[in-house]
Amino acid sequence: MKITWLGHSAFRIEIGKATILLDPFLSHNASFSGQDIKHVSAGVTHILLTHGHGDHVGDTVALAKETGAVVLANADLAAWLGSKGLDRLEMGNTGGTIALGSFSATFTNALHSSAQITEDGVSHALGNANGLMLHFEDEASILAMGDTDIFADMALINELHQPDIGLVPIGDRFTMGGAVAALACRRYFNFKTAIPCHFGTFPIIEQTADKFVAGMEGSKTDVKALKAAESLSI
């Protein structure tokens, strides 16, 4: 398994026959600047979306049309994407598990909102914000928390799914900050590896992973604070 952080909450995950883009906010992502969209989208089989905000949907429509990738999203967001011309859509909702060939994805809870703002400035709700629990046969499992604050039912997510790897938002203001994210990981999860994300993209969110790294000191979790475009093989 190879996980590449593309900046913000965007990841490329390569495993077996699957090449996944998660929340592919790329062309307007300052952290992605200097990377090649065609390179990171090459061979993509699936695009997975945690919720409908622009900094997560990102380049989904263009990339899905270009690559033919299957797009997974909550039902409301999937319907909206269908209106944009996408037809290879897998939709679900909180608690549902979708089989996607060599892996499965379960929609978990997240404390956040989900919407798109149209040109007239109106915000249109697009279902629930979610995390995504990814299970691969005979490989480490991944919980992409999505955008969220800490909540006690994270313990149930851990009990049900036992995720090995956590993709953890730490930027504050729109999600939990680094110290709270560390508390969430230590109290509710038994991650073998935690990768912080959703930081450093905009001036108004945390610029480094320092608070998260400090909060995780002494835990059994291996924290990998990647640089944009940096990869981790597991």
From Swiss-Prot:
Q: Which Pfam families does the record cross-reference, listed alphabetically?
A: Lactamase_B_2 (PF12706)
Please tell me whether the keyword tRNA processing is annotated for this protein: no
Record keywords: Hydrolase included? yes
Q: Which SMART domains match?
A: Lactamase_B
UniProt GO molecular function: hydrolase activity
Q: Which UniProt keywords apply?
A: Hydrolase
Q: Which domain of life is it from?
A: Bacteria
Entry similarity comment: Belongs to the UPF0173 family.
Indicate what this protein is called per its UniProt record: UPF0173 metal-dependent hydrolase Rleg2_1519
